[in-house]
Amino acid sequence: MDQVATLRLESVDLQSSRNNKEHHTQEMGVKRLTVRRGQPFYLRLSFSRPFQSQNDHITFVAETGPKPSELLGTRATFFLTRVQPGNVWSASDFTIDSNSLQVSLFTPANAVIGHYTLKIEISQGQGHSVTYPLGTFILLFNPWSPEDDVYLPSEILLQEYIMRDYGFVYKGHERFITSWPWNYGQFEEDIIDICFEILNKSLYHLKNPAKDCSQRNDVVYVCRVVSAMINSNDDNGVLQGNWGEDYSKGVSPLEWKGSVAILQQWSARGGQPVKYGQCWVFASVMCTVMRCLGVPTRVVSNFRSAHNVDRNLTIDTYYDRNAEMLSTQKRDKIWNFHVWNECWMIRKDLPPGYNGWQVLDPTPQQTSSGLFCCGPASVKAIREGDVHLAYDTPFVYAEVNADEVIWLLGDGQAQEILAHNTSSIGKEISTKMVGSDQRQSITSSYKYPEGSPEERAVFMKASRKMLGPQRASLPFLDLLESGGLRDQPAQLQLHLARIPEWGQDLQLLLRIQRVPDSTHPRGPIGLVVRFCAQALLHGGGTQKPFWRHTVRMNLDFGKETQWPLLLPYSNYRNKLTDEKLIRVSGIAEVEETGRSMLVLKDICLEPPHLSIEVSERAEVGKALRVHVTLTNTLMVALSSCTMVLEGSGLINGQIAKDLGTLVAGHTLQIQLDLYPTKAGPRQLQVLISSNEVKEIKGYKDIFVTVAGAP
């Protein structure tokens, strides 16, 4: 019998183009193989002679991590079989065509994600084996696979929460919500490598690389690592936070337009934190990383978000008799808004019923298991007050449900409760609507309707779990029991007379109506109303007052009085932060009793409007003319204007232009050509910043067709 010639591997075709398309990774490119777990991919192996299944034995070996181990799940050895044996590593469904072998490789839906090397060992009979490298591939989570913990059974939702590479962050104030376009860019060149670089620079990996890699099959673990690594409080994470006003050593958080530049800068500088970020930047960068790794993720904004460090579900704020909001040494705050992420996953570590959206917050606010990270906390657990469930559920519950107590301070002591608000925190919880540029309110996912029996019952349930059965008496409860919070003889409201624009005088209207109360059920009262205006900081604090005003009046029973107020531009011109937020507060003192009432109005100033127009049909590789128009509607010139354009699939990186000074009342028109590189829905984002206004921002949705398409 003639001896069969040795089987040698001549070449391998990883079929990256076909596989990447079938695994929804073609947007990352087709130069290398990028696949998702729990789904087969295909190879073509070319040999020196036809493969003979009865004589030739092929063993596949896949390895990832620094010390691959089958025990740790970072090394897999599997043989060529006719039928796929189940949710395990396998090579099956092969066909022989002359000297080539087409084979289907399957990775289990609980495999470790990461960069893999793939090789085969070929032997004949009892002879020795020869090893051949096949190449490398990247393995990601697979939300299209029903067996994966991140499975999301809706193609529409998958297109939004995995494939969409742009979106919106919602900022401002609950009554002045602004949409902030953001370029996630999760499919841009090198981003996938940077995502794994983030995992590899974590403290978990530095402490025990082999163990860390072995746990990357667990989406809960990976999410917590990423949450800690987006901030730099414990490690060389991606972003350094800055909530002050001096950004001279870096970039103002308001000037970032997308995640790509941040991630590329972090990687290029060897993992040195990028300066600077605030909550919406942290959350947007985490959204990029998680979508890139294959976890359905969205960015969520919570307006009037509590930062309740002492876990008593109460936030105290203080005013003096001149209506000035006072700073305090306490770390508890009410942020104008706060931004976090939601990731979709199964929670096998929790009792049944808590799967689905989970809160993850990369902004460094408090430690969790020794590191500055937060979550995943089940949104369902937050809604039901199940604050005993992991991870960090009490902190997130307080962010959307804490009570607010407003005190009048005198002689250094809290003298009077001005308000006890049970529904002022956790307002207009928002995310981008699926398939639309509109905002969607998801407040009902986090809490029952304010004031409903269910909402108060859940609040008491969470309070008992967080504070214990021997709940200490809170100071404001003592005052409530002693009658410290009574009905008031008048109702006060502050309204804006017209839309507030930065650079214009602000016109307000005070409305006061005399109503019956227990002390003075009828008859006139005298009021002294002291007003104060302060710059409102994103973190909930204020700066020194820049405007004061006092009104004295007599108010007859049953009558309503309107009093106009003028806040001149000259008063606030150089006093505001980049967010352009103003808090106008008033303390009305009743002359007959000495008791006080509070009225508040937060004002978000509108920046000038930016217009973006595209005149032609957009095609890949063809010049696309873009027109940008800005009219300076302010009373002052905009100096040192710069324009930056960004958009995945439209621009490689960014386009920056210096525009000089734009005189008050004048219009600036810019034309430029773009050359789209990718087909499909794209978004062009434009930011014009100046010394006076940092965030004149606009966007344009553009659908790019394949070149030559009808």
UniProtKB/Swiss-Prot annotation:
Keyword flag Transcription: no
EC number in record: 2.3.2.13
Group of enzyme by EC: transferase
GO molecular function: metal ion binding; protein-glutamine gamma-glutamyltransferase activity
Pfam families (alphabetical): Transglut_C, Transglut_core, Transglut_N
InterPro entries for this protein: Ig-like_fold, Ig_E-set, Papain-like_cys_pep_sf, Transglutaminase, Transglutaminase-like, Transglutaminase-like_sf, Transglutaminase_animal, Transglutaminase_AS
Keywords recorded for this protein, A-Z: Acyltransferase, Calcium, Metal-binding, Transferase
Co-factor binding comment: Binds 1 Ca(2+) ion per subunit.
Cofactor: Ca(2+)
Tissues with expression: Widely expressed.
Keyword Metal-binding on entry: yes
Ligand binding (Ca(2+)): N401, D403, E450, E455
Reactions this protein catalyses: L-glutaminyl-[protein] + L-lysyl-[protein] = [protein]-L-lysyl-N(6)-5-L-glutamyl-[protein] + NH4(+)
Active site: C279, H338, D361
PANTHER family cross-referenced by the UniProt entry: PROTEIN-GLUTAMINE GAMMA-GLUTAMYLTRANSFERASE, PROTEIN-GLUTAMINE GAMMA-GLUTAMYLTRANSFERASE Z
Family named by the database record: Belongs to the transglutaminase superfamily. Transglutaminase family.
Purpose of the protein: Catalyzes the cross-linking of proteins and the conjugation of polyamines to proteins.
Name of the protein described by the UniProt record: Protein-glutamine gamma-glutamyltransferase Z
Organism: Homo sapiens (Human)
Name of the coding gene: TGM7
